[in-house]
Amino acid sequence: DRIKEGIEDESPSLSFINNLNLTYNLTKADKYVFNAIFRNNLSNAPYQNELNKMWAAGSTESIYSYVNNHTSSYSPALDLYFQHTLPHQQSIQVNVTGTLIHTKNNRKYKEYKDENAPLADIQTLVDGDKRSVIGEAIYEKNFKEVKLSDGVRHYQMRTENEYKGSNPTTSKMDQSQTSAFFEVQGKVKDFSYAGSVGMTRAWFKESEEEHAYYTFTPTVRLSYNLKKAGFLRYRFNISPAIPSLGSLTDVEQAMDTIQIVRGNPLLKTYQQFTNSLSYSYSKKQFNANLSVRHQYYDNPIMESIFVEDGKLILKDENQRSFQSLNAELMVGINGATLFGLKDFLTLYASGGYTRSWSEGLNYSHMYDEFYYSVMAQVQYKDFSLLGQFRKVQNNFFGETIKKNENQTAFMAMYTRRNLQAGIGIMFPFTNNYKVGKERISEVAPFRSETFVRETGQMVVLRMGYTFEFGRKHKAGNKGLNNSDTDSGIINMQR
């Protein structure tokens, strides 16, 4: 057994993200909407470092490990959308999105007693290119009491990733997802209903490995207007989850001297079953909502960790099941009159509880989580003061818990006509912003925490002014939105 203990790293942790979008919209009311967006997403994270002290169980002799990770990507995308209103209460929507993703990942790992004489030096260089096209079309027809819809969607992608360094290899993968559906919506007095049936085909190919999977995707939505007593809603649906290309790739890369990340081209698409029930009530400024949701994943793709030839292998596999049960209550008042001041106070509070069960091929875990939030805002004429606290819910899946920092913020704002100015503070009671990750595996338990001192007591300044001139154009809304952000590179952040 080897024990690893993190050491505070004084080196900077930098991340640059730039999103540059060019949008064109042409709308003729009740006739058509054409929208074109040219997106350019650039990211660069040059200093993602990690320093650790390590020793064998029962030994006092230690060594050090250091990880330097530099990732960058550039992703241009062209998103075209067209909506046309046809005679006899008909309409059609079409969306086509093409995306290129170029990714570079340079990861260096060293073990040493003397930094100038490393005991191990592992380097992983990944140069990845991905091309994808997403096309979707929906037709709708309205009758007096019923609305009919049908549609198709196709997602085609190809990646070419070159892995250099200590374990060089090249991966070329093709993947597609095709789906079609038919839906009926209607209303009978205070009762509304919607039902749809659909089918999804997922396909994957790498070298001689090729798979195709089919998933039935029904949806049921029911709602009942209780009038003065509130509103009741129910929803059930089955949706497919296809493996990511990064998990499917037939590649293995060493994280360090004992851990290896391995792809799995045998991964299968799995089904997600969701049931949700909610009750909402509102009267004047008072609002309340109670919701319950149950999710069940059949043979989900989750992590597996096992020992092979003295090494720890980290690999995604189709496990037995994952399910979660969530209940959440929200109550609030919006724009209440107080001390004779109209629309002076807005106050919301919410709380929830989630229990999750993760059933792997060789593990079984249960995880409980409480979370809550409180928000208050007072407004007088052009001035407003906002305060918020959130105990953020952690994310649990497989054998990993991703932990989030609680969030506190205060903001003072002044708004007049086109001018908006404000000053605020985030995390006023936090010296170190902390996020973490814990792996509760019996084979290889792991816990890490990342601190960012600069985030504590962070002052925020906000200034905005809206310029208006010339003729005003009311842009039509975009009814379909598709995008691709998966680079297809094997995940080394475990």
How would you label these PLM feature ranges?
Residues 1-2, 45-59, 105-113, 160-169, ...:
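Outer-membrane beta-barrel translocator domains and adjoining extracellular loop/strand segments
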Residues 15-45, 66-209, 225, 289-294, ...:
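Face-selective signature of the C-terminal outer-membrane beta-barrel domain
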Residues 180-186, 216-224, 275, 279, ...:
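Feature captures outer-membrane beta-barrel proteins of Gram-negative bacteria and organelles
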Residues 211, 230, 240-289, 296, ...:
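Outer-membrane beta-barrel signature, preferentially recognizing the C-terminal barrel domain
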Residues 294-297, 301, 316-395:
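Gram-negative outer-membrane beta-barrel transporters
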Residues 351-358, 370-415, 420, 424-447:
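C-terminal beta-barrel architecture of Gram-negative outer-membrane proteins
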Residues 416-494:
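C-terminal beta-signal and adjacent terminal beta-strands/loops
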